[in-house]
């Protein structure tokens, strides 16, 4: 029994990863945003749309512990910017309904300028 318990503890220690930093968790989101921005500058709007969608998806799946560390303005502000960028890419692709839906999500995030 002692060997089994030691084996379980050892296996847990080997597979457990250290807690990721806030920046490490946000890095994939930032990468998508940057790729989306570069694609927009290069007029590759379909690629930009994919990247902005992925950034939003990744941000919305962050652990609650990370999202609660963000104050309301930063959380809403971050998503607001990505929804706005997504709407811009969609409008360039002549996806009017999708662009309007993205703008509605932008407004729903609050703190609109």
PLM features per residue range, with description:
Residues 21-23, 59-76:
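Flexible helix-coil transition and linker loops at the boundaries of alpha-helical arrays
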């Amino acid at each position: 029994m002692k060997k089994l318990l030691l084996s379980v503890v050892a296996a847990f220690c080997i597979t457990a990863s250290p807690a990721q930093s806030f920046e490490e968790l946000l890095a994939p989101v930032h990468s998508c945003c940057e790729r989306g921005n570069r694609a927009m500058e290069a007029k590759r709007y379909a690629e930009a749309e994919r990247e902005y969608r992925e950034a939003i998806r990744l941000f919305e799946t962050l652990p609650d512990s990370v999202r609660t560390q963000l104050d309301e303005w930063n959380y809403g502000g971050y998503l607001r910017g990505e929804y706005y960028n997504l709407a811009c890419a969609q409008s360039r692709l002549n996806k009017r309904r999708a662009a309007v839906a993205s703008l509605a999500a932008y407004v729903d995030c609050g703190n609109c300028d």
